[in-house]
Every structure is written in structure tokens, then in C-alpha cells.
């Protein structure tokens, strides 16, 4: 029986991560460090003997570039890939493009903290984490998971908050639990699933 392999990786450091800006659906590329992180992710996966049958990513450059660099390291540059905005980062609305310190100065530290760290309170014109999960989860269940369960070795390169949606389901986390989960840039997480789609094993390639 073929293995049910699912690997999740957050994009490498972006130019706006470096500048401490709210990014969301804005589209900066990777920094030099981000490029290095993505290549290292590919090398780590190769060292574990992994190759893939299919990949998924968002409509944003930083995730697509990360995926390309990983696949180049794996010697799989032509891997079939689906891109979909369901995997885009959380939309930060009016916060997008603002320095996080400037946002605190404008709205107050407590309000910005609520927007960033609550489960269901969106910033003006943007999405809450709950909203982000509401678009990412159906895509995972309908488009990604069926292939994994058929034995397609699957790689997903996306964003901190859209990946939280997948992790919330995989690890059966509560809203409070997923809020506490931080995802490092460019670090693959390897899941192997049981036939009922629950997690058989998990390996985080941090470090």
C-alpha cells in the first residue's frame, strides 16, 4: 500500500516579514534569507528520501517561489501544481502594508493585539482567523485530502494562517490551541495519515 504523505511548509521569509509589515494578500517576494530557507527545506526533504506526486500553493508569489525552490532542490521542477487563493494568507484589510508599530500607534496596542490574536475578530476590511479557516478548510477537504488518501505524496507550500487551518484539522486543535501555534518560515512538517485521514505520525523538520 502506498503511503499517505502530506508535507506542509510555510513560505520562506518575505521582504515584508523583514520590514515587520502586515502582509496578507499583498505580494512581496522572498528575501535572500527566505530563498535560503526554501532551498534548505528542499535539502531536508531530500535527505529524508522524499519525492512528491503533486503540489499545492497559493496565488501569492512568496509561496510559489518557495515551492519552486524546494522542487528544484528535489529535482522535480515540473511537478503538477495547483494554485488557489483558498490557500492565500489571511487578508489583513486596512492593516495590510502597515508597519506593526505604526498600526499600534494608530489603533492602540490592545486593539491591534485583538485583531492579530483573536479567533473571530477581523481587522477593518479584512479577515479573522476564523474567516481564513472557512475558505482554506473546504479546499483541503475537497481538493487536497482525497489525493493524499489515494496515496498521492502531497506537498503544500502556503502561509502561516492558511496552514493553521490544515493543522487544526490534522491535529484536532481547538480555536485556542491553533491560536498558540506559531509556524516558522521555511520549515517542513511531515505528516503520514491513516486511512481515516487522522494522523499516524508527524515530524517537524525545524533545526
Swiss-Prot record:
Binding site for substrate: 10-17, 23-24, 62, 89-92, 100, 116-117, 160-161
Alphabetized InterPro entries for the sequence: His_Pase_superF_clade-1, His_PPase_superfam, PG/BPGM_mutase_AS, Phosphogly_mut1
Alphabetically ordered keywords of this record: Gluconeogenesis, Glycolysis, Isomerase
SUPFAM superfamilies: Phosphoglycerate mutase-like
Any GO BP annotation: gluconeogenesis
Leader sequence segment: none
Active site: 11, 89
Site description Transition state stabilizer, residues in chain: 159
UniProt xrefs under Pfam families: His_Phos_1
Recorded metabolic or biological pathway in which this protein acts: Carbohydrate degradation; glycolysis; pyruvate from D-glyceraldehyde 3-phosphate: step 3/5
UniProt-recorded Gene Ontology molecular function terms: phosphoglycerate mutase activity
Cross-referenced HAMAP family: PGAM_GpmA
Similarity-based family: Belongs to the phosphoglycerate mutase family. BPG-dependent PGAM subfamily.
Subunit structure, interactors included: Homodimer.
Role of this protein: Catalyzes the interconversion of 2-phosphoglycerate and 3-phosphoglycerate.
NCBIfam families: pgm_1, PRK01295.1
Name of the protein this chain belongs to: 2,3-bisphosphoglycerate-dependent phosphoglycerate mutase
Amino acid at each position: 500500500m502506498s503511503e499517505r504523505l502530506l508535507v506542509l511548509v510555510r513560505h520562506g521569509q518575505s521582504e515584508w516579514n523583514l520590514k515587520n509589515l502586515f502582509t496578507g494578500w499583498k505580494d512581496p517576494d522572498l528575501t535572500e534569507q527566505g530563498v535560503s530557507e526554501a532551498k534548505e527545506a528542499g535539502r531536508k526533504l531530500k535527505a529524508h528520501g522524499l519525492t512528491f506526486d503533486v503540489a499545492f500553493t497559493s496565488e501569492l508569489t512568496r509561496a510559489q517561489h518557495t515551492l519552486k525552490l524546494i522542487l528544484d532542490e528535489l529535482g522535480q521542477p515540473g511537478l503538477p501544481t495547483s494554485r488557489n487563493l483558498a490557500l492565500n494568507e489571511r487578508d489583513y484589510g486596512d492593516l495590510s502594508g502597515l508597519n506593526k508599530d505604526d498600526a499600534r500607534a494608530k489603533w492602540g496596542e490592545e486593539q491591534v493585539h485583538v485583531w492579530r490574536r483573536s479567533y473571530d475578530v477581523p481587522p477593518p476590511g479584512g479577515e479573522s482567523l476564523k474567516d481564513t479557516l472557512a475558505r482554506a478548510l473546504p479546499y483541503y477537504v475537497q481538493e487536497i485530502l482525497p489525493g493524499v488518501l489515494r496515496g498521492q505524496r502531497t506537498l503544500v507550500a502556503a502561509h502561516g494562517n492558511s496552514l493553521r487551518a490544515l493543522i487544526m484539522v490534522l491535529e484536532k486543535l481547538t480555536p485556542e490551541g491553533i491560536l498558540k501555534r506559531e509556524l516558522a518560515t521555511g520549515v517542513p512538517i511531515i505528516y503520514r495519515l491513516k486511512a481515516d485521514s487522522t494522523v499516524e505520525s508527524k515530524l517537524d523538520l525545524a533545526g
